[in-house]
């Protein structure tokens, strides 16, 4: 059976590339004058894959996703798969103060009302996928990240900014056949944290720092400064999601030799496409 996609407003930047490998279902998505969303499905079928990234405006993209799901069910589609390159609220995964919700749990339950399968990219806490009532898969785009940097690293190494991100660095390094490690963080004072790369010599080498999300970029800037002080030749920074605060792209770019993120969120440094990973993981089609 030919695979059919619906592209939400938050994934329009992926539509052209996806259309080279699969059919895009005809839809009409627009806004009423009062700001409410209007969705109409113009074709019928049985199985469909909806692609919707939920970056800012997060709530608008999420509500649109639900309305798309309802419209597809109304049009007779029986099996709905959802690909969410960037899942909003994924960092709100625990209660830190009494009276707070676990916001990502609420989002997962809401999506589960319409969608049978959920595919997300490099979610902040993979355990939160258990909140989704159906099949849920976390995809880490290690292959496309590795291929992008293959010719830039040579005899380099891959570093995680902390122990929690080590698995990401390991996956990329293993594809490239390179050494990997992480930074150890030690709090010296309430305002100062010491960062040290563990058990590696960076002098004269190109280094790639890998993380899931860049927001303010402060950690990456500090890590790059330390690596340069230790004699690193070039420092590259990559993340799956570029959730950049104002001015962060410029600040990080000044501190490193290259900054790149995937296109789960469209930014001016979204240089690495996740569409090949969608095709591999969801469609099992080489692209």
From Swiss-Prot:
GO molecular function, one term: kinase activity
UniProt binding sites for Mg(2+) 2: 162
Chain residues that bind D-ribose 5-phosphate: 187, 211, 215-219
Binding site for ATP: 34-36, 91-92
GO cellular component: cytoplasm; ribose phosphate diphosphokinase complex
Keyword Methyltransferase (UniProt): no
Pfam family, one: Pribosyltran_N
Keyword set, alphabetical order: ATP-binding, Cytoplasm, Kinase, Magnesium, Metal-binding, Nucleotide biosynthesis, Nucleotide-binding, Transferase
Extent of the signal sequence: none
Any one of the GO BP annotations: purine nucleotide biosynthetic process
Cofactor: Mg(2+)
Active site location: 185
Pathway terms, separated by semicolons: Metabolic intermediate biosynthesis; 5-phospho-alpha-D-ribose 1-diphosphate biosynthesis; 5-phospho-alpha-D-ribose 1-diphosphate from D-ribose 5-phosphate (route I): step 1/1
EC identifiers of the protein: 2.7.6.1
Cofactor comment text: Binds 2 Mg(2+) ions per subunit.
Enzyme superclass (EC): transferase
InterPro entries recorded: Pribosyltran_N (IPR029099), PRibTrfase_dom (IPR000836), PRTase-like (IPR029057), Rib-P_diPkinase (IPR005946), Rib-P_diPkinase_arc (IPR037514)
Entry keyword Disulfide bond: no
Entry-linked CDD domains: PRTases_typeI (cd06223)
Family of the protein in this entry: Belongs to the ribose-phosphate pyrophosphokinase family. Class III (archaeal) subfamily.
Entry function: Involved in the biosynthesis of the central metabolite phospho-alpha-D-ribosyl-1-pyrophosphate (PRPP) via the transfer of pyrophosphoryl group from ATP to 1-hydroxyl of ribose-5-phosphate (Rib-5-P).
The protein, known as: Ribose-phosphate pyrophosphokinase
Encoding gene, per UniProt annotation: prs
């Amino acid at each position: 059976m030919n695979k059919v996609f619906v592209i939400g407003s938050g994934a329009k930047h992926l539509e052209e590339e996806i259309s080279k490998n699969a059919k895009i279902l005809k839809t009409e998505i627009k806004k009423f004058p009062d700001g409410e969303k209007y969705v109409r499905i113009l074709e019928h079928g049985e199985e469909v894959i909806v692609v919707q990234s939920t970056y800012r405006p997060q709530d608008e993209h999420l509500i649109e996703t639900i309305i798309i799901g309802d419209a597809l069910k109304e049009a007779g589609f029986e099996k709905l798969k959802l690909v969410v390159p960037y899942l909003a609220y994924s960092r709100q995964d625990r209660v830190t103060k009494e009276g707070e919700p676990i916001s990502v749990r609420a989002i997962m339950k809401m999506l589960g009302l319409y969608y049978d399968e959920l595919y997300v990219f490099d979610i902040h806490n993979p355990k939160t996928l258990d909140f989704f009532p159906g099949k849920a898969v976390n995809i880490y785009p290690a292959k496309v990240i590795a291929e992008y940097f293959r010719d830039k690293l040579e005899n380099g190494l891959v570093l995680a900014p902390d122990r929690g991100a080590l698995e990401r660095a390991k996956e990329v390094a293993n594809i490239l056949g390179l050494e990997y490690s992480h930074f150890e963080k030690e709090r010296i004072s309430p305002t100062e944290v010491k960062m040290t790369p563990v058990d590696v010599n960076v002098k004269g080498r190109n280094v790639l720092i890998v993380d899931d999300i860049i927001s303010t970029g402060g950690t990456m800037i500090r890590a790059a400064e330390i690596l340069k002080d230790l004699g690193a030749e070039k420092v590259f920074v990559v993340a799956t999601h570029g959730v950049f605060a104002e001015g962060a792209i410029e600040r990080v770019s000044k501190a490193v030799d290259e900054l790149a993120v995937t296109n789960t969120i469209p930014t001016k440094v979204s240089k690495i496409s996740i569409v090949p990973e969608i095709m591999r993981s969801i469609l099992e089609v080489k692209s």
